[in-house]
Amino acid sequence: MPGGKRGLVAPQNTFLENIVRRSSESSFLLGNAQIVDWPVVYSNDGFCKLSGYHRADVMQKSSTCSFMYGELTDKKTIEKVRQTFDNYESNCFEVLLYKKNRTPVWFYMQIAPIRNEHEKVVLFLCTFKDITLFKQPIEDDSTKGWTKFARLTRALTNSRSVLQQLTPMNKTETVHKHSRLAEVLQLGSDILPQYKQEAPKTPPHIILHYCAFKTTWDWVILILTFYTAIMVPYNVSFKTKQNNIAWLVLDSVVDVIFLVDIVLNFHTTFVGPGGEVISDPKLIRMNYLKTWFVIDLLSCLPYDIINAFENVDEGISSLFSSLKVVRLLRLGRVARKLDHYLEYGAAVLVLLVCVFGLVAHWLACIWYSIGDYEVIDEVTNTIQIDSWLYQLALSIGTPYRYNTSAGIWEGGPSKDSLYVSSLYFTMTSLTTIGFGNIAPTTDVEKMFSVAMMMVGSLLYATIFGNVTTIFQQMYANTNRYHEMLNNVRDFLKLYQVPKGLSERVMDYIVSTWSMSKGIDTEKVLSICPKDMRADICVHLNRKVFNEHPAFRLASDGCLRALAVEFQTIHCAPGDLIYHAGESVDALCFVVSGSLEVIQDEEVVAILGKGDVFGDIFWKETTLAHACANVRALTYCDLHIIKREALLKVLDFYTAFANSFSRNLTLTCNLRKRIIFRKISDVKKEEEERLRQKNEVTLSIPVDHPVRKLFQKFKQQKELRNQGSAQSDPERSQLQVESRPLQNGASITGTSVVTVSQITPIQTSLAYVKTSETLKQNNRDAMELKPNGGAEPKCLKVNSPIRMKNGNGKGWLRLKNNMGAHEEKKEEWNNVTKAESMGLLSEDPKGSDSENSVTKNPLRKTDSCDSGITKSDLRLDKAGEARSPLEHSPSQADAKHPFYPIPEQALQTTLQEVKHELKEDIQLLSCRMTALEKQVAEILKLLSEKSVPQTSSPKPQIPLQVPPQIPCQDIFSVSRPESPESDKDEINF
């Protein structure tokens, strides 16, 4: 296998596999430690059998097993369990829980936190052991109606159990149980595996077969193997003297190295049939003993040890020397490592040349042995002149000589010359050249030459003639595999794919190739007929059909229809099967491996063998969006079926559809989003609440003077904005209430009027600037409403004063009024004295008798005479005439009773300005006094650090009444409430 050199060595999260292996005989749950209530993300089959719940029923329930609590469950134990989870501790409890059928059972519950590579607790492991037999019988409603016999039986059973508990156990038995429990349910932080991605680990005394040391060692063994393959035939054929200490030591060192290699093979990992790396020492030893151990042992026996002794029989020495040929079995090491070396092009070329030369060397040794055996006839002690050795000796001038004293033949070519000549002959024969200077003459030599030519022709044709074709036929998948890898590498290099993603791509290709062995399943199935293809698909998906009860009632035809639609995919660690937000268009069955479901960066479920995830297509009409990511933790094999294909089969097989929808339970439904709260978020909220609780609040009471002061400023600002934005701000109405004088006297033409200002912004009579001031003169409008009559008198005072710059106070208003009087003065100068005369007196009786004030219709007509204005003023109701101050700008055609002279108008305006300035000064002084008192109170309260109390109302501050002028009314002007008093009136 091309990918078999290293095996599947990508980092993977084998936490679930390790826990299942260690707790194979127990029941356990896995809960997420980062989500509120620690929901269950995995439960093994043992817990499902013990509790009676299906895995889908247990998922997302609390790891504290609160769903199994009942009326007999101890409340204190429940609280201790929750505290253990809150504190991320390890602990064990004896707790009474209820099965799904509400049967009470005593459990020995052990809790242990699982940490990741950052030492953060991410999971909780909860193991359960049924200890009901060791506890007292549970008293519930079902046991209250027992008969006397049943109670007697229970009493006997209790007595026996008590005796067994009180009887001292055997020491060995106790140690055995303790060690067994420690092996299966050890909950120490050093023993429990971590939940993280990690490369496959090996024990300390196990060597990885792909590590640098082992790779170097394999190349050394390869070189020594070739050395053995060369020297063993040479020593056997040419009978080299074993007394050569150097060669003897070298051979002994080689033998020791091969013995060390045997020891290392007992501690070296190997690749299993599924592509996984086997690091279990027991499996490694059994595998080596069954395969290459015997061959390696025979090739490492010290056959030269006999040569270390002197006076050894020549026959025995030759026998042991011949046994050295067994060392050629070391070539098996080359065969088993051949797939390692064939991955390199230069190594392939070197190996081919070495093989050709090695065969030529072996044939040369055999060729010399034949010549040496035939050149001297041991029976007659004569030399054969037709042997190739004799002919060679004659040709090179080193003939054989007979030693009469010793009775043996001596001389002849040297061993080096003989070996070179033998190798020369075999090479020319193998390459079909054959120069003819060395040729076979005897029958044996000719027979060997024929055999050598046959082998040589085949070897030559194989290695040099058709090497490319043979490799393509023998390693077609290998060539395709390397071609695919090269294409992928070029693609990744061309588009500069990141290193991490490149490694994932390469690992996925290697792992997929190791699983499929380079065989295109779809291509093979397309060759088969429909019936055979369906049978093959049923066989390929047999694990899904046999493990899930939803397929048990399916007919053969239904299974065949489903099997054809199933697809098998292989996922590498870290691969995402579903991204959050993408469409869920397939139903996935986990056959091997483990996956995790991640929602909002939290693990909400861990899926293993036999789990199903996806969507319930047969109950939903729309295509679902994945609410979480599904990521592979290890190498996974998934069998998936598309939504359309599944619905098509269910629509056709209606009977199976009902059974399928009823019996198939999804372990994880990606359509439904799991609602949870993170413990970290809850802690943050609690910290924020505590922080706000501990903060010192700097709030001021509602009745505090400072709050009242700022509230007053705010109200004044709002009212000022409202006053400037009124739709008809031309008329600033004043409510005037007439009331009798305090002394009770009635003065003709004089009344007491209370003027309450509607707009609380102004503390004195002011003029409001309107939009019409750009076209005509500004005038003040006031309504006088006496309280005495049934029908209140409404008097409008029309002022001829023009406001150019809007509302003003103090000297600013005086300045504006002065400019207005100067303009008015010019106007009055153009009016004659006769036209400005009118009746100024009014009969008091007439005013008292009438309930309403009638307006005097004054009409002014301009004559055509130069500068003379005629007046048809009638003086029948002169007492009711209005002053020029009461002139309304809106009544342009009204009749005017009289027109005062310019000096009187100027005097009136000055008096008004004077009064207003005094009022403003008095009001400002009062407010400054009030503000000073309030500031003093604030400073006093702040210094004492006590709760401020509501200030008492401030008494009214009377203002000095200015000197009266003739026909002057007394007004009482009210202003807005201040923080010091509810009513603050100013009389003048």
Curated annotation (Swiss-Prot):
In the UniProt record, the gene name given for this protein reads Kcnh5
Q: What is the location of the Glycyl lysine isopeptide (Lys-Gly) (interchain with G-Cter in ubiquitin) cross-link?
A: 785
Positions of the UniProt region annotated as Calmodulin-binding:
704-715
Write the lineage as a comma-separated list: Eukaryota, Metazoa, Chordata, Craniata, Vertebrata
Annotated catalysed reactions: K(+)(in) = K(+)(out)
Region annotated CAD (involved in subunit assembly) sits at 909-948
Compositionally skewed regions (Basic and acidic residues) per UniProt? 871-885
Topological category with respect to the lipid bilayer: Multi-pass membrane protein
NCBIfam families (UniProt xref): sensory_box (TIGR00229)
Q: PAS domain spans which residues?
A: 14-86
Intramembrane segment spans (from-to)? 420-440
Organism encoding this protein: Rattus norvegicus (Rat)
Q: What is its main location?
A: membrane
Can you say what this protein is called? Answer: Voltage-gated delayed rectifier potassium channel KCNH5
Query: What stretch of residues is annotated with the motif Selectivity filter?
Result: 432-437
